[in-house]
């Protein structure tokens, strides 16, 4: 991985990676193991102190000028799974041709050659300060704060489905100006078994049941859910009859696009060379 990533060309420079994990069973153990292997092989590691959303891991890679990163997660898949997401220096997941290049290099290495411990001074624990920097960065992408402030009392129910969105999502919503945020207490408990849902995919209607039930009791306007690593959101809103309606991913994306384009146009920020990529 070091060779394929171009890390070997950075002689004299400190090579670093960011390592995170979500709520999956044994996620912390796996993340610490990943960090120890990197450190043992001479790579500096920024290891999150506890579970964090995938987008924050991506942000940290760029913010800390790291050469790559790893998040231990199985995203929205069933509880039996865990996984290893690899990231490039730009904070995005590794794509072609680098993905195959990394595998080719991995296949050249035997387990006996892999250093598993040592150099643990190269592991630096990160946490709260990155949360603050991440929230500040999120605020910079706000297009029109006045629009939000006019809706600051929007009644919102949020659930992380036992996952990594537990703290950061409500914090970000409040930092943007929303004042009426409620959470589903049973699903704020970090648990890799996801005991309150059949599957932790927020796009499955069943996973939204507890959120909608609380929303009904509180007469909420919106229910928002994030998946275990908080890189996927589902939204439920009320239709013109006051009934809950689940907005699918495509619909959500189109609403985002409509809002962004119209507000950028209104604020004079839309240029002729702007375009959307699907």
Descriptions of predicted regions:
Residues 2-11, 138-149, 264-269:
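Phosphate/pyrophosphate-binding loops at sites that engage ATP/ADP/AMP, CoA/4′-phosphopantetheine
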Residues 3, 63, 175, 259-264:
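Active-site catalytic microenvironments for nucleophilic, acid-base chemistry
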Residues 7-81, 179-235:
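N-terminal small/polar loop signature for handling phosphorylated ligands or for N-terminal nucleophile
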Residues 12-17, 39-44, 147-155, 219, ...:
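Short, surface-exposed connector motifs at secondary-structure boundaries
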Residues 33-41, 64, 85-93, 171-179, ...:
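A glycine- and small-aliphatic-rich helix-loop capping segment at beta-alpha/alpha-beta transitions
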Residues 49, 109-130, 239-278:
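Proline/glycine-rich low-complexity loops and linkers
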Residues 70, 75, 82-103, 233-262:
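Glycine-rich phosphate-binding loop of actin/hexokinase-like ATP-binding domains
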Residues 82-209, 214:
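Gly/Ser/Thr-enriched, mixed-charge loops and adjacent short helices
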